[in-house]
Amino acid sequence: MYSGGLDSLGMIYKLLTDPEYKDYKLHIHHIHNRNVEHRDRAEAIVVPMVLKELEQLGFSFVYSESEIGSQPYNGQFMYDTDSINFFAGYICSVNPRIVKVAMGMQANDANHSLEERRIRANKIFTAFTDVEKIFPVLEMTKREIYDSLPESLRNMFWSCRVPVYTKESIQPCGKCKTCLQLKDAGIR
């Protein structure tokens, strides 16, 4: 499952280059998740750029995408962990050739609220399928993921949770959790 962020980009690159995964065919799926964060517009720019670059690097894969839109209720909104697991489970339930689903979770993705969301998301996923989830970059930091990418891919990701849009550009907010993690890692 490909969000457009650094972790999932690193996951895809590892799946395409690590000999451990050489016997698998890669199906990349991206979800245009329209919610209060408004990341979908920024991701819609970077995702096709990455796919084109991966093809230019000689990699082959299948690509598909889904769309979901949700408004906030009682100050809460649907997290990407829920929609990713919904679509991953659904796709596995209708495509028996899929034997593993890769998620871009990495070493610094840990806190109590994230764990509660992961438990809920896993229930959503397993309602559809018993396909195994794998986490190829789980033991890597953001810096290690970034450094593992070829130069041509290193800045083709969108990780900011709340982009700042103007008529001329889209900029990272510089304040959300992922922006701060990238800054701390010396990436942006």
Model-derived segments and spans:
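Nucleotide-activated chemistry modules centered on ATP-dependent adenylation/adenylyltransferase
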Residues: 1-188
